[in-house]
C-alpha cells in the first residue's frame, strides 16, 4: 500500500478536462483513486485504466496551464471529505475545501465519497408523514419521513422556489440537520440560499456549531468532474450524520445537472452515447447515487430533489430514470403557472405512495380522491366549454366546474420565501386545516363564495373572510 501511495507519474496527454497520466506499470492507481498535481491544488480522479501504466482521469478543477511532463502523485485513496459537526454552517466544494472565506474546516473525521449503499438488512422503511405546510403537497402527494421526493418541472416553473419553501418550512420546524447539495445550478441561487439560511438562523454566523445545515456547491460554471461528484460529497456528509443516529434532510438542486455532468464526462472519455445523447451508464450512475440515499435502522435521510425536465418532456431518459427511485413526485406544470397559480403543482400528475388509507387515514384518502375526481371532470369538460360555452352544460357539470375552479385556486398559497416579490405574508397550513378546507369545498359548503376568495389564502377560514371583503 505504501508503494501505491508513493507512486509518481507524469502527464502524457491533456484534452480539456480529460488528463492521461503514465505511472510505472507495477504502481498503477485504481479506478476512483485521487491523484494530486505536484505544485498545484488540482485533483484528478482516475476513471479508466488504459493499460501500459496509463490511466485516464477527470480533472476536478480547471485544467488551464496543464502540460505534458508535469508530475502527478497518487494519494492511494478515493477523494475524502470532512464530515461531522464541523461542516455545519460551512460552504464547501466537491473536495470538501471551504469556499466561504471562514478558514479551514476543522473536522476530526474524513470519509471517502465512494462507498457502498447500506445492506438490505440494515434498511428501515417508514410510514410516518412529514408535514410541509404546503396545501397541495400535503393533500395530493404527502412526503414520507425517510423517503425520496422529486420536484419535476421545466425551466422557470418554480422548482427552486418550492425547494426553498420546503427548506424554510421543514428545516426550521425539523429539529434534525440538513445538507444542501447545489449541483450545477446558478451561483446567485447558492448565494441567495446562504443568506436566506443566515437570516432565518438555520446558519448561526456568531457560533457555527449551532447551525443546522451544511452546504456543498458545484455550480454551473465549474468543470463537469466537479458537478458529477458534488452530489456524492453532500451525500457523504448526510450519511455520516445518519450513521450517528440523526434524522437528516438532504436537498439536491438539481439532479438533472448530475446526469448532464455524467453525459459530458462520458463523452470526454469516448464512450458511445445512448438515447438522446445520454451516457450508456445513465441508469447505473443514477442507481448508485439513489441507493445510498436511504434510511437505516440507525437514522434516516429524507431527500428532496429538484429535477429539471428538458423541454417539459417527462419521457426524456433523465427524468424517466429518476422517477423509478422516488416515493413521491411533485410535478410542476407550465399550464398551471400560466394561470398565475403558485405553487404550480399539477394535482393530477403528482403522486405519492403514501396516499393509502392505511397510511394517511380514510378521511385524508377520501378527500384527496374526491378533489382529484372533481379536477379530472373539469379537465374532461374543458373542451366542451371552449366550443359550446358553460350554458350548454348539465346542472351537475356546472356545479363540478365551479367547485373545480375553487379547488384550483385554493391549491395556491403565498410562500414565505416569495414575500419580497408577492408582497403578501407567507402561510404555513397544518395538514388538518388543509383536509378540512378541501372537504368543505367538495361537500358544497363553499358554493356561495366567489372563486377569487380562494386565491392565495392559507386556511378555508381566510377564504370566508376574503369573501366578506369582496362582497
Swiss-Prot record:
E.C. number(s) listed in UniProt = 7.1.2.2
Q: Which Pfam families match?
A: ATP-synt_ab, ATP-synt_ab_N, ATP-synt_VA_C
Q: Which UniProt keywords apply?
A: ATP synthesis, ATP-binding, Cell inner membrane, Cell membrane, CF(1), Hydrogen ion transport, Ion transport, Membrane, Nucleotide-binding, Translocase, Transport
- Membrane-topology annotation of the record: Peripheral membrane protein
Molecular function, one GO term: ATP binding
Subcellular localization is given as: Cell inner membrane
Q: Which GO terms describe its cellular component?
A: plasma membrane; proton-transporting ATP synthase complex
Catalytic activities:
ATP + H2O + 4 H(+)(in) = ADP + phosphate + 5 H(+)(out)
Could you say which residues bind ATP here? 153-160
Q: Which domain of life is it from?
A: Bacteria
The keyword Membrane appears for this protein: yes
InterPro entries registered for this protein in UniProt: AAA+_ATPase, ATP-synt_VA_C, ATP_synth_F1_bsu, ATPase_a/bsu_AS, ATPase_alpha/beta_chains, ATPase_F1/V1/A1_a/bsu_N, ATPase_F1/V1/A1_a/bsu_N_sf, ATPase_F1/V1/A1_a/bsu_nucl-bd
Asked if the Swiss-Prot or TrEMBL record annotates the protein with the keyword Coiled coil, the reply is no
Q: What PANTHER family does the record tag this protein with?
A: ATP SYNTHASE, ATP SYNTHASE SUBUNIT BETA, MITOCHONDRIAL
Relate the protein's function as given in its record.
Produces ATP from ADP in the presence of a proton gradient across the membrane. The catalytic sites are hosted primarily by the beta subunits.
Subunit note: F-type ATPases have 2 components, CF(1) - the catalytic core - and CF(0) - the membrane proton channel. CF(1) has five subunits: alpha(3), beta(3), gamma(1), delta(1), epsilon(1). CF(0) has four main subunits: a(1), b(1), b'(1) and c(9-12).
Q: Which family does it belong to?
A: Belongs to the ATPase alpha/beta chains family.
Fetch the NCBIfam families from UniProt.
Answer: atpD (TIGR01039)
User: Any idea what this protein is called?
Assistant: ATP synthase subunit beta
Q: Which organism is it from?
A: Methylibium petroleiphilum (strain ATCC BAA-1232 / LMG 22953 / PM1)
Organism ancestry: Bacteria, Pseudomonadati, Pseudomonadota, Betaproteobacteria, Burkholderiales
Q: By which gene is this protein encoded?
A: atpD
